[in-house]
């Protein structure tokens, strides 16, 4: 039985980079990992495979949407450290529903029996959209992980995601493993002061603190995980540490997790406004 993670967060927050590095850390610790990109721009697995791979929707179009004609090799690419990558893809811009494609991808994975092949399946899910198909990974996830930065918009999105996780937990097993503080900079922006208070307020914790560092950005543009970068890069160890920390907690199979207690949409403006 695979351990299933669903990674969410505000658009542009660094989910795909974070997801790829978590997958790499897990794989290098011996886990067989499948990362599933759930975004129409289909670049989640780029740091793992080094290319924009064929999407599930493209593969389905080639067989006129006959699921039974596809095999895992048609939709799965193997990349860094033996990690398998899959991209759900999406309809053309301005038409169709991207969430539907995510739901179709989940169905296809179940039909192919891929859940039994992996130690960890990681869903990297589009932004803070938690309606319809984009919330589907929460139906299958053991744990949700929220990526956030130390600002109001990110915290507001994280709170909305907590609402979705709380709602899904009524019918499904999903719990919130915690929040990954991304692009942490103690020289400006308060470090993690706002995120620390938010995590306490909703009953969760910070899983790790990823520093704001040019090397992380550099690795993304190079189409690599941090773990594939030159080991002589300055401060590489500091950048790798939080991802290894997350992987160790996940592989312990008993990460501290809970059902979050989100703040009301209107209430959060008053509460966050009073934080220092």
Swiss-Prot record:
Binding site for Mg(2+): 16
BP term (GO), one: light-independent bacteriochlorophyll biosynthetic process
Binding residue positions for ATP: 12-17, 41, 182-183
GO function term, MF aspect, one: oxidoreductase activity, acting on the CH-CH group of donors, iron-sulfur protein as acceptor
Cofactor(s) required for function per UniProt: [4Fe-4S] cluster
Note accompanying the cofactor annotation: Binds 1 [4Fe-4S] cluster per dimer.
Secretion signal, residue range per the UniProt entry: none
Catalytic activities: chlorophyllide a + oxidized 2[4Fe-4S]-[ferredoxin] + 2 ADP + 2 phosphate = protochlorophyllide a + reduced 2[4Fe-4S]-[ferredoxin] + 2 ATP + 2 H2O
Keywords: 4Fe-4S, ATP-binding, Bacteriochlorophyll biosynthesis, Chlorophyll biosynthesis, Iron, Iron-sulfur, Magnesium, Metal-binding, Nucleotide-binding, Oxidoreductase, Photosynthesis
Catalytic activity, EC: 1.3.7.7
Pfam family of the protein (one): Fer4_NifH
Keyword Nucleotide-binding: yes
InterPro entries (UniProt xref): NifH/chlL_CS (IPR030655), NifH/frxC (IPR000392), P-loop_NTPase (IPR027417), Protochlorophyllide_ATP-bd (IPR005971)
Amino acids binding [4Fe-4S] cluster: 97, 131
Pathway note: Porphyrin-containing compound metabolism; bacteriochlorophyll biosynthesis (light-independent)
NCBIfam families named in the record: DPOR_bchL
Family listed: Belongs to the NifH/BchL/ChlL family.
Role according to the record: Component of the dark-operative protochlorophyllide reductase (DPOR) that uses Mg-ATP and reduced ferredoxin to reduce ring D of protochlorophyllide (Pchlide) to form chlorophyllide a (Chlide). This reaction is light-independent. The L component serves as a unique electron donor to the NB-component of the complex, and binds Mg-ATP.
Protein name: Light-independent protochlorophyllide reductase iron-sulfur ATP-binding protein
